[in-house]
């Protein structure tokens, strides 16, 4: 049985959507460095729901090079839950912020990160696990420049709160239109939409749809992709928050919104940012898209060629 006392807390390294994250040493495993995530429960008095424990237990089986490993679950008493993850000290948001403005991530780097991101998602989707809250902050990068997905499956176990632990509003910038329009049925397409938004952001060095409210987010999407209708998105009229009175915008070419991306990249992005979730490209199909044909993910030199190394980012999360 794993006990909280097996872990020696070093420092607080961040506050995520679900609670505080500490850097800690695992005394039972040669003092390996881990991330100790204390989950804040919505109703402290009711304890940890058994459904959440079941969901999280399944995540321990998710072993993939592009997914942050969940080592252990500590249910210290009926009201507290800690998740023990492998420790990675940099996320994609901080990494992008560290590169001087005017300097791109580099086409090879973007392709490498996209390949790794989609591989991780394919693995999760093949196990019927959705993320539902993908964003640059929960894409972590190791010292070799490999990208790994964090917080997969937590949305199903705990729900996606409206406000993060720090009371800041959870970002809407990567949220799929079917969720924004009040849809209650999600599919793997919600994650592929988020991947498209992250793809565009890596190319542009700024978010594609930086809305500050749900309606602002919806209208920012419409201004670029056009206002959807029944023809391009069957049954959109039945979504609770869709209004026939929405302004009618025409679709713009994505090459105008993401000018640095080549034709194959634009085609892939176009297939990710499809309104109808059933027609959105899957992770499996995305990996065989021509955009990746000239990608050699084994070439780790790309990481240093295109970019600043990450040694200087130690102790960040």
From Swiss-Prot:
GO terms for cellular component: cellular bud neck; cyclin-dependent protein kinase holoenzyme complex; cytoplasm; endoplasmic reticulum; nucleus. It holds the Pfam family Pkinase. Signal peptide: none annotated. Residues 296-317 are annotated as: Disordered. Keywords: ATP-binding, Cell cycle, Cell division, Kinase, Mitosis, Nucleotide-binding, Phosphoprotein, Serine/threonine-protein kinase, Transferase. The active site is at 133 (proton acceptor). It comes from the Eukaryota. The keyword Transmembrane helix does not apply. The modification Phosphotyrosine is found at residue 18. ATP binds at residues 13-21, 37. Belongs to the protein kinase superfamily. CMGC Ser/Thr protein kinase family. CDC2/CDKX subfamily. This is Cyclin-dependent kinase 1. It comes from Candida albicans (strain SC5314 / ATCC MYA-2876).
């Amino acid at each position: 049985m794993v006990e909280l006392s097996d872990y020696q807390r070093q420092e607080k390294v961040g506050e995520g959507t679900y609670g505080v994250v500490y850097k800690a040493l695992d005394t039972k495993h040669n003092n390996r460095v881990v991330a100790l995530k204390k989950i804040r429960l919505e109703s402290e008095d009711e304890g940890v729901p058994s459904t959440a424990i079941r969901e999280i237990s399944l995540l321990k089986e998710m072993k993939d090079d592009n997914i942050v490993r969940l080592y252990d679950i500590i249910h210290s008493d009926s009201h507290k839950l800690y998740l023990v993850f492998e420790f990675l000290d940099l996320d994609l948001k901080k990494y992008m912020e560290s590169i001087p403005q005017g300097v791109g991530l580099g086409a090879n780097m973007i392709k490498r990160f996209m390949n790794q991101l989609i591989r991780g998602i394919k693995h999760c989707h093949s196990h019927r696990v959705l993320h539902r809250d993908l964003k640059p902050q929960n894409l972590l990068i190791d010292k070799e420049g490999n990208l790994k997905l964090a917080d997969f499956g937590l949305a199903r176990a705990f729900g996606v709160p409206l406000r993060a632990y720090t009371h800041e509003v959870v970002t809407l910038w990567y949220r799929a239109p079917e969720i924004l329009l009040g849809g209650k049925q999600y599919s793997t397409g919600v994650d592929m939409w988020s991947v498209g938004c992250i793809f565009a952001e890596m190319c542009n060095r700024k978010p594609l749809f930086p809305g500050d409210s749900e309606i602002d987010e919806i209208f920012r999407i419409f201004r670029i992709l056009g206002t959807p209708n029944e023809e391009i998105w069957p049954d959109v009229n039945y979504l609770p928050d869709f209004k026939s009175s929405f302004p009618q915008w025409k679709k713009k070419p994505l090459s105008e919104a993401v000018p640095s991306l080549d034709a194959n990249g634009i085609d892939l992005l176009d297939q990710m940012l499809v309104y109808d979730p059933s027609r959105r490209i899957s992770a499996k199909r995305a990996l065989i898209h021509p955009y990746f044909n000239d990608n050699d993910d084994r070439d780790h030199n790309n990481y240093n060629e295109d970019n600043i190394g990450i040694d200087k980012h130690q102790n960040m999360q």
